[in-house]
Regions:
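Conserved alpha/beta enzyme-core scaffold
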Residues: 1-240
Length: 240
């Protein structure tokens, strides 16, 4: 099955109001900027999608990517580990104005909650956060004399990620740190949308090099020269 699409707009066209989105990227590394900005374009033009929940390692940086979504008013809730990046102005402004909610999750717990969803595990126990505000209201159990906090899986309607290579069937490879949470997000989401630097024919990727099998991918867009979020932030650029 050919999963390629011809434009960022086509790729994100099915994302609706109130969706939970997992967006790949660790800081700016591996951020799918073109897909995210296509989603902002659609919101600016139509007012949709809105009331989004975004799951990412951080809450955006500068005025691009996730920060552009927050700036536009599309996002009502962030689930992340680091809400304060090197330039957190977009999230900070909305949060102080009570226009966005935050669920703060320790980074290892965030990754494991996403992984658990992909593996079909509804809950697990971790010692992380026990005795802190982050554990308030959560079940606690004792194993071998040590207290553990119960955490629930973290599912999403859509994952939006960036890959290095993809074939038309959706099999993916990644480049270095750009891999980050992306493989887990593809497994935890109902629909996965991918931008890849290069799309090749089925069979051109060595099966031993495939990180995300195509069964977890629904749409693939080739972006030969992707924008680098960190470069945009350092240069002070903003979403259009």
């Amino acid at each position: 099955m050919d999963k390629t699409v011809s434009s960022p707009e086509q790729a994100v066209a099915g994302i609706g109001n109130g969706a939970v989105l997992m967006i790949g990227g660790f800081g700016g590394s591996g951020a799918p900027v073109e897909l995210v900005h296509a989603l902002v374009d659609r919101y600016v033009a139509t007012g949709s999608p809105t009331d989004l929940t975004v799951v990412n390692n951080n809450a955006g940086n500068g005025r691009v990517g996730i920060a552009a979504m927050i700036d536009a008013g599309m996002v009502v809730r962030m689930v992340c580990s680091f809400p304060r990046s090197s330039d957190p102005r977009a999230f900070t402004e909305k949060y102080l104005a009570s226009e966005i909610d935050l669920e703060l999750v320790p980074q290892g717990t965030l990754a494991e909650r996403i992984r658990a969803a992909g593996a079909g595990i509804p809950a697990f126990y971790t010692p992380t956060s026990y005795g802190t505000e982050l554990a308030e209201g959560k079940p606690v159990a004792e194993f071998d004399g040590k207290k553990y906090v119960q955490e629930r899986w973290l599912q999403a309607d859509v994952a939006i990620i960036k890959a290095e290579l993809a074939d038309a069937h959706g099999n993916l490879t990644y480049r270095h740190a750009a891999r980050n949470f992306s493989p887990l997000m593809c497994m935890a989401a109902g629909v996965s949308i991918v931008q890849a630097r290069k799309v090749v024919a089925p069979g051109d990727i060595d099966p031993e090099h495939v990180v995300t099998p195509g069964i977890f991918v629904d749409a693939v867009l080739e972006v030969p020269e992707p924008l680098q979020e960190e470069e945009l932030v350092r240069s002070g650029e903003a979403y259009r």
